[in-house]
Amino acid sequence: MKVEIYRLSAEPITVEVEEEATVKQVLSAPGTGAVLGDDEHSLLEAAERRYGGLDQLGTLRVNGAAATLETRVTEGSTILIIPKVEGGC
């Protein structure tokens, strides 16, 4: 099935994963690191390298609802990563 991964500050990508996949399985798929500009790694690996872990990357949503790594996705789902806001006024 196809699932889209979108980070608010990046171009979305679409990946092919097995039915009943979890968010963690989707973000572990080869090439998903492209969301962070790292085509050679999975998004989980790229987040670990760049931010020290996925939890430092931001908030996860699936089709607009709050999600965890164990949330199941369905055909056509969109995983949205809302980056943490850094700095301030």
Label the model's feature ranges:
Residues 1-89:
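Ubiquitin-like/PB1-type beta-grasp interaction modules and other compact soluble beta-rich domains
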